[in-house]
UniProtKB/Swiss-Prot annotation:
Lineage: Bacteria, Pseudomonadati, Pseudomonadota, Gammaproteobacteria, Enterobacterales
Biological role: Required for repression of mntH by MntR. May function as a chaperone that makes manganese more available by delivering it to the necessary cellular locations when manganese is limiting.
Localization per record: Cytoplasm
Stated name of the protein: Small protein MntS
Signal peptide (UniProt feature, chain positions): none
Name of the gene this protein is made from: mntS
Amino acid sequence: MNEFKRCMRVFSHSPFKVRLMLLSMLCDMVNNKPQQDKPSDK
């Protein structure tokens, strides 16, 4: 939980461009996870 708070602190102090980059990375991870977890669907 402390790591999460630290991440949020860094996130809140980071510039807007960095926030967008982190959000896009997070979205990519979320979008790629189901495809990797269920290869039998394809």
